[in-house]
Amino acid sequence: ITEAKNGDKEAFVRLIRMNKQSLYKTAWIYLRDEQDIADALQNTILSCYENIQRLREPKYFKTWLMRILINECKDILHQKNHAAELDDFAEGVHCEELNLCEWKQLLLCLDEESRKIVELYYFDEFSVKEISALLEMNSNTVSTKLSRARAKLKKVIRR
């Protein structure tokens, strides 16, 4: 990260490659359209490259990068004037008891904000602290919403 901040283009490319899967998954959660995702990713990478010197704490690079992406996604949604529905999961979701279609259906019982939190926590493996920074929420609020979402999902699964 320090190398990228000092202008090392290859170091910057390595940082983006290390985070490409999380970037794509997060963009998919918000946009669900390949062209919009490509636009958001391109704008995010460009913005990150142009502003990496402003990153104060290198340990928060991923959170900072994801915040830029989420803002880009929100801008695209605003421009298109439509709401993002999260009725699909990113690839690679595995569960012994539920298949992908069942997971998709199961998450529909949650409100949009709770779905985002669950997906970021379980599928993108963000910590509560990182999610709170990404979604600009208090970490206690994220923990509470995550706990309530788990309880609701368990209740629905038991039916």
PLM-predicted stretches and their roles:
Residues 25, 39-46, 50, 59-71:
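Structural recognition of an alpha-helix C-terminal capping motif at a helix-to-coil junction
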Residues 117-121:
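A short pre-motif secondary-structure segment
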Residues 70, 74, 123, 129, ...:
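DNA-recognition helix of helix-turn-helix
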Residues 5-14, 24-43, 134, 139, ...:
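Short, charged helix-capping/linker segments at alpha-helix termini
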Residues 5, 32, 43-60, 80-81:
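Sigma70-family region 2
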Residues 50-56, 67-86, 148:
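Arg/Lys-rich amphipathic alpha helix in sigma70-family domain 2
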Residues 75, 79-108, 127:
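Internal acidic/polar
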Residues 20, 24, 45, 111, ...:
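C-terminal flanking helix
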